[in-house]
């Protein structure tokens, strides 16, 4: 049974069970009164189960028709899809980083709060808060991957921490996803639009089904700089801590940050910029941004060379393949017809069709909007040669991950990540952390660890077509428990290590440091 209150305000390591303290039960009345003047379109309801087993926990895709200020969402209707298609996709978002709900034995009754930030003039910034009736005094604040919504972590993180008694908060980095501009145009139909999939190649593997669908990502707009990603991670922590105190009548004792991909970036920045708000963080394949090393250096190389690699029948010795490998990418996994030798599947092809071009387009338009994306070609973008143009270096520098962490941080990353290649992403951030402290790690309170998941990749669902891969989620969740034990019980964090295919994080690893092989059969 769900009791709902809607207020139109203008505003595998196992920890020993922690005894759950007595506290007031959270209720929507007191929460709503507190959030008046801070939130808009606030919805608060008590649920018998805050896990995703309950269909009400995660809203349906495209279930929002307006911005939080009441203005209608933009977009055109194509292919029978609603005009608001793409702006708000919670169900899709939770499955991007996880294959499904984290199995837990019992329901978690409590209060869920959904709202927008009153302070955002664009009407896009949103958050969700979950307060279990039985609370352990602690809070988890989640980042959001890609351009995903505040429900991005529902499977991987919310389902994992709520049964342990944590309150949970998440946000959308202050920005919605995308809206449809056109379907059917061969060329770019409007400035700042990106096509969802690249066009199919003659004689190649099937391409993405939406090569003629053009969308506009909200976060390329001038009033949505990537610097807001850090702002909303910190703002959500403050808001959730204050609301939890009202809900339970007691202050939060510990706050942890978790997040994946761009959400992992938010975790890193939280440890760098918000040590007064957090006790530690786990970043799962977080995005590394540096003026001289970022995905705009690597991705165009892959976009440019993949068609030639495919035309060479996915020959790993082809010049195109060697160019992609030289850009830091892990090796491809190719499945072939045993009788004909023709490729039937390619890991790189999946990334090319679904991520490489559209991510290049989006990031280039954000940091270097004067480049002619589809006239000159996304694969021909040369970031380093354009650093001297007005605004490019400054906009990247404003979002740099410095490595100057002030609270304990664990990075968990897959060696087969072909969107954020581990050589130039997770390992680069590890180098930044070490450089900031001259290698002196364990003698500091803000310890850092990098746990590399051998054969793990960026997209958990790819383990189905490519069973050679392994999921990262179990290691990320284990890392969270290890972090909590370290912060609260002074337990030693296992050293940075290569987690062998099918293994777990070990106190005495067989392979400390980086994985010698990115892929093992």
Predicted regions, residues:
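Bacterial N-terminal signal peptides that target proteins for export
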Residues: 1-9
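C-terminal His-loop and adjacent cap/lid subdomain of alpha/beta-hydrolase
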Residues: 25-521
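Intrinsically disordered, low-complexity sequence elements enriched in Ser/Thr/Gly/Pro
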Residues: 1-2, 21, 92
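N-terminal leader/targeting segments
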Residues: 11-12, 143
């Amino acid at each position: 049974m769900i009791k709902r209150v809607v207020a139109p305000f203008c505003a595998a390591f196992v920890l020993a069970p922690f005894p759950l303290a007595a506290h007031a039960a959270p209720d929507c009345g007191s929460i709503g009164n507190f959030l008046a003047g801070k939130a808009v379109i606030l919805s608060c309801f008590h649920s018998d189960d805050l896990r995703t087993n309950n269909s009400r926990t995660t809203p349906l895709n495209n279930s929002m028709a307006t911005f939080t200020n009441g203005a209608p969402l933009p977009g055109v209707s194509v292919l029978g899809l609603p005009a608001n298609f793409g702006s708000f996709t919670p169900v899709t978002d939770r499955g991007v980083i996880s294959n499904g709900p984290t199995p837990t034995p019992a329901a978690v009754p409590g209060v869920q709060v959904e709202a927008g930030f009153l302070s955002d003039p664009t009407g896009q910034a949103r958050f969700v808060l979950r307060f279990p009736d039985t609370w352990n005094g602690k809070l988890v604040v989640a980042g959001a991957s890609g351009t995903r919504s505040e429900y991005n972590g529902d499977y991987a993180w919310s389902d994992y921490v709520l049964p342990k008694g944590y309150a949970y908060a998440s946000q959308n980095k202050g920005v919605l996803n995308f809206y449809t501009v056109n379907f059917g145009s061969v060329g770019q139909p409007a400035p700042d639009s990106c096509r969802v999939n690249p066009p199919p190649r003659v004689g190649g593997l099937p391409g993405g089904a939406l090569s003629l669908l053009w969308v506009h990502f909200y976060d390329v707009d001038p009033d949505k700089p990537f610097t807001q990603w850090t702002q909303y991670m910190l703002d959500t922590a403050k808001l959730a801590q204050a609301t939890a105190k009202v809900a339970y009548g007691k202050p939060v004792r510990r706050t942890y940050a978790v997040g994946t991909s761009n959400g992992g970036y938010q975790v890193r920045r939280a440890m760098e910029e918000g040590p007064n708000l957090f006790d530690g963080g786990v970043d799962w394949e977080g995005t590394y941004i540096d003026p001289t090393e970022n995905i705009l250096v690597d991705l165009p190389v892959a976009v440019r060379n993949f068609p030639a690699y495919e035309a060479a029948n996915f020959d790993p010795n082809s010049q195109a393949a060697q160019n992609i490998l030289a850009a830091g990418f892990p090796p491809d996994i190719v499945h072939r017809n045993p009788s004909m030798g023709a490729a039937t599947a390619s890991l790189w092809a999946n990334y090319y069709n679904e991520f490489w071009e559209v991510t290049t387009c989006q990031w280039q338009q954000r940091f270097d909007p004067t480049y002619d994306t589809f006239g000159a070609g996304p694969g021909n973008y040369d970031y380093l040669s354009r650093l001297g143009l007005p605004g490019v270096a400054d906009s990247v520098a404003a979002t740099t991950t410095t490595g100057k962490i002030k609270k304990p941080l664990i990075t968990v990353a897959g060696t087969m990540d072909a969107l954020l290649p581990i050589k130039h992403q997770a390992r680069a951030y590890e180098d930044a952390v070490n450089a900031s402290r001259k290698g002196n790690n364990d003698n500091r309170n803000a310890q850092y660890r990098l746990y590399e998941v051998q054969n793990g990749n960026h997209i958990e669902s790819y383990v189905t077509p490519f069973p050679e891969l392994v999921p990262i989620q179990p290691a990320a969740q284990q890392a969270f428990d290890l972090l909590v034990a370290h912060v609260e019980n002074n337990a030693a964090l296992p050293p940075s290590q290569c987690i062998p295919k099918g293994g777990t994080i070990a106190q005495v690893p067989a392979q400390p440091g980086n994985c010698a092989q990115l892929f093992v059969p």
